[in-house]
Amino acid sequence: MSETPRVLLVGAGAVGQVFGKYLQAAGCELSFLVKEKYADEARRGFTLYELGMLEKDLEPVVFSGFGVHVSNEEVAARRWDQVWLCVSSTALRAGSWVGELARATGDATWVMLQPSLDDRDWLLQWIPAERLVSGMIPFISFHAPLKPGERFPKPGTAFWMPPMTKGPFSGPSERLPRVIRTLRAGGYPARASQDVARDVAIPSAVLTVFVNGLEAAGWSFERFLQHDSLERVHRAAREAVQVAASHTKGSASAVLPLLRPALFKLMLPIAARLTPFDLETYLKVHFTKVGEQTRLMMKTYVDLGRRAGLPVEHLLPAH
Ligand SMILES: NC(=O)c1ccc[n+]([C@@H]2O[C@H](COP(=O)([O-])OP(=O)(O)OC[C@H]3O[C@@H](n4cnc5c(N)ncnc54)[C@H](OP(=O)(O)O)[C@@H]3O)[C@@H](O)[C@H]2O)c1
């Protein structure tokens, strides 16, 4: 393993660019593996905006100075210490590229960030547990502007790290410390966790059902907060939380009493007020982009719930 970690980020979208910025700041030798259609844009470099809590003029920051690859052959010609998967859960399963990339990247540590309940099990087909680190994405990033008239001097990727946030990572003791050390050296607030999959399973279940309900309400907070919509979402969220707890051998007992329609009524306006961007528009834009992933995750709750003999009737798609 080299002193300067050689890092390959798969996917140079909203998330890949942000992790790339921190890893480059840590001194990593950085490359992206992108689809051919994005290669020119990536080679020109990206424009980043870091959002704070205060509304002030935004300074675009140029993010460049990394390699750009478009094929496994190019990747296989180099040695890698870390491979970061910055794509959706559905992109992981599209074709056979993950297995091929695993063969092209030798003994590298793989860092997965995907949210679906069975992503880790799925990846273990190709990457042994001794080399697989799991992380959760605590920031929000998006292509800016989200809508016309916003305060960005030119198009780019905006990101917001909520105050006091720590991004959890878990994995084998021989690999995890180096990933965390590297991120911290770049100024990223990383922390070690016993089991990220378990930490995030329940919040992710609530978020997924919420997003599914918001989509059914036409991405409108006002319509989402109406009685019938809230009732449906709260029942489905209870089922998803129980599936998530059962699958990760965790407990839902502390969360279930809190899961009430009133919780969404209370939290949504607070969240909208705290975010330094238009939350309603972000949710619509982002979760339309990863809509297939939300459907995959909903189906996964149903499949795993049925297998475990748990109720799933409110998680089923409406006909
Ligand atoms: N952005 C956020 O605020 C945020 C927050 C928390 C979690 N996440 C999660 O992070 C994941 C990525 O989100 P994102 O916002 O970064 O999405 P994104 O902006 O769409 O970026 C993903 C990029 O990876 C590309 N890609 C897909 N398969 C690839 C492959 N085999 N090789 C190389 N590139 C590939 C995609 O291409 P195409 O455009 O052709 O699909 C896209 O350019 C999702 O699971 C999302 O739910 C995102």
Outline where the language-model segments fall.
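Rossmann-fold dinucleotide-binding core
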Residues: 116-203
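Active-site-proximal catalytic alpha-helix in oxidoreductases
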Residues: 196-241
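Helix-loop-beta segment of a Rossmann-like dinucleotide-binding subdomain
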Residues: 153-167, 217-226, 277-288
